[in-house]
Regions:
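Two-component/phosphorelay signaling modules centered on CheY-like receiver
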Residues: 11-29
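Acidic, metal-coordinating helix/loop segments flanking the phosphotransfer/catalytic sites
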Residues: 30-48
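Receiver (REC) domain active-site loop signature in two-component systems and cognate sites
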Residues: 55
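C-terminal output helix
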Residues: 106-116
């Protein structure tokens, strides 16, 4: 069973994504901000982190940097899922090492397809 860590501070998005990925037989972990995400990631070693950018405490960019600097997480894929949809935001996310950058609002079907493609 693949492990996914959903990192977002919007409860409705978290609930929707959690439901979707559990239905698709993922083991799902939830974090509300970057610092909580890093704690969970180091403990659970997820196959993929679905990461928002604009969050309290530690933002998505900083969280991604920390994930990329952690040897135990070197095989973990990271997908940004953000409302920040300017070309400069997307470029920054990919330059920092995100495997994909998807924007909100999003199609659940497309999101699941993108994640399955990354993990298979």
């Amino acid at each position: 069973m693949k492990k996914i860590l959903i990192v977002d501070d919007e409860p409705n998005i978290v609930m929707s994504l959690e439901y979707t990925f559990k239905k698709k037989n993922f083991e799902v972990y939830i974090a509300r901000d970057g610092s909580e995400a890093l704690q969970i990631a180091k403990e659970k070693i997820p196959d993929l982190v679905l990461l928002d950018i604009m969050m309290p405490n530690v933002d998505g960019y900083e969280t991604l940097k920390e994930i990329k600097n952690d040897k135990s997480l070197e095989h973990t894929k990271v997908v940004f899922l953000s409302a920040k949809n300017k070309a400069t935001d997307i470029e920054k996310g990919l330059k920092l090492g995100a495997d994909k950058y998807l924007t909100k609002p999003f199609s659940v079907k497309k999101l699941v397809a993108e994640i399955n493609e990354l993990l298979n």
